[in-house]
Amino acid sequence: MIQTFNELGALRGQIAEWKREGLRVALVPTMGNLHGGHHSLVTLARQYADKVVASIFVNPTQFGPNEDFSRYPRTPEADVAGLEQAGCDAVWLPSVEAMYPLGVDKTTRMHAPGVSEVLEGASRPGHFDGVCTVVARLFLQVQPDAAVFGRKDYQQLAVIKQMVAELSFPIQIVGADIVRDDDGLAKSSRNQYLSAEQRPVATSIHRTLLGMREGYVAGQSRAQIEADATAALQADGFQVDYAVLRTPELAEPTFDGGGRVALIAARLGTTRLIDNLEF
């Protein structure tokens, strides 16, 4: 039976007991409102550890001034049930007061320069500072041997890898493949905001990513690939934040050849969707 913890001392006691037994612990950080993509992170975490701890915390420091923290769906009972079915051993459910004892406005914040300041960082200033701040605290609280993050949030994964390397956290960071519906739409908590009419239109993001890959393989210029992708999304009714081709390190490519990642962020109505494709 899955264990739930609301108090840090009790969680640390259980983790210490596991570690005395020589067991490896993996962490799966989440903000709740979980779906099959999140459950796949737990399944993957089991390959890297003997015990899996998931955290559920809607983090106020990663919400911008125009992003409604209070409206983010909170479904803890369903989330815990789903995590148990996925094979999770424990769930950490901290309060805002426990995570930020000095208050959100006065808390010490983390910043990962460079990679956190482009793309999502440019569209959502301060977002990755909030992500780094909460993830660093979760690492210190849980002290996992491994932590699993979805590749759907490609830039977030890159930011966390940079923070872990620079601060020498002794934690293995694992990226989990994107989980998609049968029509290609990446699973996301935001998909529930799409109307019945918008839902089939949203699949054009994945088709556009595939088109960007085809353009790259065919030798098209980066400028042409990005322009065509933006035009295709706009034709389907999207407001495009970015549709870009980058190196795996999220730098602008300066030469042909090598791996690439295509990244898209676009708004359909009021719903902002992100996706990416590595090739």
From Swiss-Prot:
Binding residues annotated for beta-alanine, in chain numbering: Q62
Disulfide links within the chain: none
GO MF annotation, one: pantoate-beta-alanine ligase activity
GO cellular component: cytosol
Entry EC no(s): 6.3.2.1
Pathway(s) the chain acts in: Cofactor biosynthesis; (R)-pantothenate biosynthesis; (R)-pantothenate from (R)-pantoate and beta-alanine: step 1/1
Gene3D superfamilies: HUPs (3.40.50.620), Pantoate-beta-alanine ligase, C-terminal domain (3.30.1300.10)
Reaction(s) this enzyme catalyzes, per UniProt: (R)-pantoate + beta-alanine + ATP = (R)-pantothenate + AMP + diphosphate + H(+)
Top EC class for this record: ligase
Entry's family note: Belongs to the pantothenate synthetase family.
PANTHER family per the UniProt record, alphabetical: CYTIDYLATE KINASE/PANTOATE-BETA-ALANINE LIGASE, PANTOATE--BETA-ALANINE LIGASE
Name this polypeptide is given: Pantothenate synthetase
Source organism of this protein record: Stenotrophomonas maltophilia (strain R551-3)
Taxonomic lineage: Bacteria, Pseudomonadati, Pseudomonadota, Gammaproteobacteria, Lysobacterales
